Structure formats: C-alpha cells, structure tokens
Amino acid sequence: MAVPIRELDCLDALIWFGTGEAASDKLCISQSSISRTARKVAKIFHLELIKGQGEWTLIGDQTCLNLERHLHQKMRLDCGDPLRLEAQFFYAKSYAQMIQNKHLLGTCNFLDIARPIELLRNHVVDVWIAGYPDLPSPDDPDLTSIYLTRHPLHLAVKRDHPLVQLGDSVTLDDVRQYPCIALKDGAFPETQRYLESLGLWNSQVPVRRFNQEGWMEHAAERPSVSLASVLSIGLYDDPLVFLPIDLGHTTGQTFVVRREHENHPRIQALLTSLKIGSLALAKEHAEVSVGFES
C-alpha cells in the first residue's frame, strides 16, 4: 500500500462527509489533523483538494487513488475494521442503532443517488442502504442490489394544511393546486419520472444534503405537499400527516454492495443483521413487507 490506512481514512472522510467538522466528529480526530493529512495523501496521488459549494472535493485523475482505496477496502473487510455504510436519509434511522455500535455510518443526508453510487464505485464506502426504485441498473457490472423492505409512498402535509380540511374527499386535482416538494432534476430519476406523470414534482428544494432548516424554510414559502412513508414521516421537526390518496408507488430499503464483496462473510453478516431489523419493521408497521424469505 502506498499510504497507511489511517492516513487514507482522513482523505476519504473529507470527501465522504463533505466538511472537516463532520469528518472530525466521525473519526474523533481534530479538524486540523484531518486537513493536514488529507492534503498530504492527495499530493501523493497528484491530486488537488479543494472546497467548493461548502464541501471538499478532489481535482485530477483518481485512477491510482481508487486502486489504493480498493486495497484498503479489502484490508478493511478481511481484518475486521469497521465497515463503512451510507444510507439514504429517509431510511437511515430505521437501522442506525444496530449499525452505529459496530460500523462507521455516514451522515446519511445525501439527497440524490449519484453521490452514494460514486462512493461505492470508488471504494470509499462498503454498503449503501438505498431507496427503491432509485437503484443502480440490474445489469450494473460493479454493483448489486438486495431488497430489504417495501412499502407505499404517500403524500404528506402539515396538520394545518388546507388539504387536511377536505378529509377523505381530497383528490390529486386538489393536491396539484399546491407546490409538491421535489429534489434537483435527476436526483431520484425513477421516482421523479412517476411523480412527474402525476403532475406532482414541481417545487425544487435547492439543497444537496438534507437539513431541517433548509427543507422547512422552502416548505414554509407556501403550503406545500411532501412525500413520506411510514418509516420517514416522523423525521421532520414539524409533524406531518398523510393525505388519504393512493399514489400507486412503492418505495423501500435496498442493500447495495459491490458484486466482488457480496459473498464476503462480513458483508453477509451485516446483511443478515439488517434483514432481522427489516422483519422487526414489518412486524411494527402493517404497510411494510420484506423482500426476502424469512
């Protein structure tokens, strides 16, 4: 290996978590040490570490760096170091408790699928808990997806929203009179395609990572409609309620991993643990079903 494991950890943490503060919190290392070490490693691979839009990124050809990351990933798996997991914000809390004591869990605030997929391809993270149906292609040569849970996606609003007053008579035509919170174009392509066909993807939130302040500030501009499931509706500071409308759209948690590591004993042990957690979620919530044989 060209660099020690803990030194590459510092660079990967900056790229993965986005900020020195978040990297410091996760690794329990001072921000100054992380920054100094990350720049040292970037220089070894002839890369430039820069900060743009509030997050750290690398400029240059990362081929050699990713080969080094590949070696470190194999060491991580074989030597028992904590695995690195990222999860879509809407589903992270469901599994966080069983993950955090054994593995390194990301900030779980990405509001797209492109960034987590890139982190998987570049060997920065080992597993991504993604949201169905926005997944890598089934024909993807590097990544494979294993279903955990499935459940309906709902429309949700604040308790004082005018649509709540319509009760069971509310319709999609009623909903279309209000902005429906959407993410940046292409962030969740399959979900976007379906909701656009219903006229329900029309008020973009200008944030790359989830934060309550930015999300709720956008939602407060006009009485808006959000998307939620039984597993995510409790994550917002302002209480939301479901509208009694069947969207006909299914979401759920999916375990995404590199094909080469799918059958590694540690990956299989983690998957088994998450399946047990999924069964508990299905037992707690009638809408949740599991995507595997129990």
PLM feature spans:
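N-terminal hydrophobic or amphipathic helices and topogenic motifs
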Residues: M1-L111, G277-S294
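Short helices/loops that flank or line small-molecule/ion binding pockets
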Residues: K26, A114-W128, Q212-P223
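Secondary-structure junction motif
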Residues: S94-A96, R176-G199
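Short beta-strand-centered segments that line the small-molecule binding cleft or hinge
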Residues: R115-V157
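Short beta-strand->loop
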Residues: D142-L153, V230, D237-G252, H261-E262
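Flexible hinge/capping segments at coil-to-helix
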Residues: L148-L153, V157-C180
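Hydrophobic hinge/microswitch elements
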Residues: G186, L195-V241
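A late-sequence structural motif
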Residues: I245-A286
